[in-house]
Each structure stands twice: as C-alpha cells, then as structure tokens.
C-alpha cells in the first residue's frame, strides 16, 4: 500500500485548480458562457496539469452550480497517471459513513493519489453558526478516521451517533487515510485543523500576517503532539515580462 502522499513530496508541492464551479473565465467574477464549467474542458485542464508535472489539483465544491467533485475525481482516476487530487468535502452534506466509503473507494481507484479538503460552510436551507459548523466538521472528521482505521465506528456526539461496522471501508493509504487539507482563520477552525488536519491552507496576506498564522498553527498543533504543513492559494498571472504581467493585472 502507498505511504501518505505528503511524505513523497520533495520541497514545495506546486498544484493547480480544476474549474468545477463557475467556470474558467479570463477575469475573476466574470461569467462568460464560453468558459462555463464542463466535463470536456475541466478534464482537459486536469490531464494537461498531470502531463506538466503538477503535484496536486484542487477540485472545489459548490452547492449551487458546477460539477460534483467526487464524481469528477472518479471519472479522472483512469485518465491520469501521477497527479494527486484534492477533493473538496463540505461536512454535513453527505452521511459520514457513506462519505468514508466513497473516499476509500476513490483512494483505491487512484492508488493513493487522493487528498481531501475539509469545508465547513453552510448548506442551502440551513443556518448554523460558525461555531456549530466547525463542531459538526470535528465530528465528521472523527467518524471518517474511525471508518478508515478501525473495524467498528463507535461515536456519540451532538450531530451524529453511530455504532456500526466499518468493514471493509478502508482506503488504499493504510496510514490513517488521505491527507486532510483545511482553510479557515476563526479560532474554532484553527483549533480543528491543529488537532485533526495535515495541511493548513492560507490566502494571500502580508509576510508578517502569514508568519503569524503559521506560528499560531504550529503552536496549537504542538499542544496535540502534531505537526501541520502549510499551503498558500494564489492566482498567478504569467507573461513574458513583469511589466506585461502587471499591466494585465491592472485590467
């Protein structure tokens, strides 16, 4: 069985983005029908990223538009060779034991090339507070980990109460399951990541702000005898010269 995918990374993991939600537009916020998200366009992008040597590709989730990330990743499993898939999972959207089964099945299809992005946003028609959503995500993660590492799920919390067999819901990665990525700045989210997740995702900030976030996460993870890696999601504009890139960015 494959070892945890993070252990095989040399230096930084350079990843790409699959436009599963609103499409692949020229400018942020634009909704050009020509670039509407589709299987044909998005699968082509991912196959190109695989051929170019990118380490991972984020497959985001949307509950209003776009394609289903789990189905998309399943379809791409036989069409790619090396690239990992970072599939976004919105906690509470799927029944946790069945979600564990789906992720384990995907991990076998990909032979360990699967990572999971934990999302805690609200679902349409619900209105949970941030604290409640992170509490629910905490329960979902614990159930997933039990499903992947034990033969019986025994869990009782505020949102879920299970006592059922988890055989043979075991992922290809026999070291606790796929790596968990997480992004969020609230205290509850930071603590959740420190205790359970493997990679903390951040957005463009000043260097002092990023350093502060990393120091906070490192210290909190140490309280759980854990270490957490870090990721940064940015939009990159590439042109032949810096001047051309800056001019395009100003449009």
Predicted regions and their residues:
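Acidic (Asp/Glu)-rich catalytic clusters
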Residues: 7-9, 46-51, 73-82, 103-114, ...
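Alpha-helical packing segments of well-folded alpha/beta enzyme cores
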Residues: 41-45, 49, 102, 140, ...
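Long hydrophobic segments that form regular secondary structure
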Residues: 173, 186-209
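Short, conserved secondary-structure transition motifs
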Residues: 232-246
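Hydrophobic faces of well-ordered beta-strands that scaffold small-molecule active sites
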Residues: 12-18, 57-59, 84-89, 114-118, ...
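N-terminal beta1-alpha1-beta2 module of alpha/beta enzyme domains
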Residues: 1-80, 173-178
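Flexible, glycine-rich active-site loops centered on histidine and acidic residues
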Residues: 2-35, 93-159, 204-218, 227-229, ...
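Active-site nucleophile and cofactor-binding loops and adjacent substrate-binding regions
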Residues: 62, 66, 87-95
